[in-house]
Amino acid sequence: MSRTLLRFLEDGAMSDVTVVAGDSTFLGHKVILSLHSDYFYRLFNGDFTSPDTVTLDATDDAVRTVFTYMYAGCDGLNDRTIDDLQSIIVLADYLGITKLVDECVRRIVSKVDVLNCVGVYTFAETYHITDLQRAAKTFLTELLGSKEAFEELSQDDAVIALRETRNIVDRRSILRAILLWVRKCPDRIEQLKVLVAAVDDVDDDDNVYTIYERYAEELKDMIACPLSYNCVVVVDRDRYVRLINPDTLWSKRVTYIRKRAIGDRFTVVCMNNVLYCLGGTLDGAPTCDVLAYDLLTNEYSLMPEMGHYRRNASACIVNGYIYVVGGVDEENRLIGSVEYWQPGMEEWHDAPYLQANVETATVCYRNELWIVGGTVDLYHPTFISAVKKLTDNRWMSMEPLPEPRSGATTVVYNNRLYCIGGRIHGGAYTNHVYNYLDESRTWERVGDMANVRRNPSCCVYNKAIYVLGGNTNAVEKYNGWKWQEVGNISTYPACNNTAYPFFYTNDEI
């Protein structure tokens, strides 16, 4: 049947419409074009006389590809260049052929690399193709770390790469990329302010030479941070701090967290290569202890105690501070207090109170503390869908989750906030994953995990989300398109665990 329809297109037999594209003419059939294209359906089925000739502003190659798709269902996209695919997307989008657009997007994603990611990102941004934009953006951070690729960029492309990654990578990577680009050609120094403006760091009173010298001096004093990592830090099933490469499943135990130092139901966060174990139970009673373990020096130390006894608390790092939220106190009551502390401070300080809760998800999103869902009644388990952020020392309500949820994990990936897993109505564990859309202030459900999880650990590791633990040993990876199981790693269930990307300098990996 497909060959028969294609022959009608090739021969023009029984055609009733002529489509003109440049110097080329195509003989088509209104019923077939209307079947596949929203544009042609409206054009040929209105209350006015249907035209016999249609002119399209597209290349004849793009029109031929789109027509072949409509008549034969074969897309002929395998050997197409990115430029070809972009031309087809523009035409297919104009004609309202969504499936062909999606297929072209998938083909482009498979071809994106550091050499073409800026052009792909610009195209996706222009035509509002969100999925393609996200995929291209994952390569922009890698582009900043590639000396050869970044210094060859035009000024406009360098500005795009810097602008879109300035809130994702560290300042050292930004400064290094800017200086590398300027040093490539002597006359580029005059364009320095344009690049600096892309990262919102411009001072009108400074000339380009002053800015260059300041950046060079600042870069000298910075500790090098890797643009990529080779392992993830977790607390494993037997309470060892373990380094794991999720791709190869290489692992190494580096220390044991003894129960006489800290009991169970503690909360783990990591900042600047130091693990912090917060609260928990010791001899069955909640504590306010804070134990630090330095991954680089292999040393333990006690930090200032929290102001409240708490177990099963939630915590995260925000702008260099550790924030601890909720939990259960020594009288088995839910806690509404929020505390914060940073290394060097002699004591913890109180942040504004919240509704008493436990198993709320915490995350640093756009340099602010966000809390998502949680449990507000232990004896008659009651989950909430509330989402709040701490802005100017007060809590602001954001768009709630589509359904009440407790014990989820949250992570920022490609500048987007994700809420993963947890418990929903009736206490059932879930594999649902939601993405927060800033533009519309709504939550969008994306691909589900293969496994249901409560209180999993999660981190972004080398351009993908990795989820570990949460009542299963299965490790899953999300690349922005789909979830994939990559192995099995056991994590310690009697704590609110962490998963922290890390660069291990030993040659064992």
From Swiss-Prot:
Disulphide bridges: none
Highest rank taxon of the organism: Viruses
The Kelch repeat ranges on this chain: 274-320, 321-368, 370-415, 416-463, 465-509
SUPFAM superfamilies (alphabetical): Kelch motif, POZ domain
One Pfam family, short name: Kelch_1
UniProt keywords, alphabetically: Kelch repeat, Repeat
Domain called BTB: residue spans: 15-79
InterPro entries on file: BACK (IPR011705), BTB/POZ_dom (IPR000210), Kelch-typ_b-propeller (IPR015915), Kelch_1 (IPR006652), SKP1/BTB/POZ_sf (IPR011333), Vaccinia_A55R (IPR024182)
Keyword Repeat: yes
Presence of the UniProt keyword Secreted in the record: no
Gene3D superfamilies xref list: Kelch-type beta propeller, Potassium Channel Kv1.1, Chain A
Similarity remark: Belongs to the poxviruses Kelch family.
Protein's name according to its UniProt entry: Kelch repeat protein M-T9
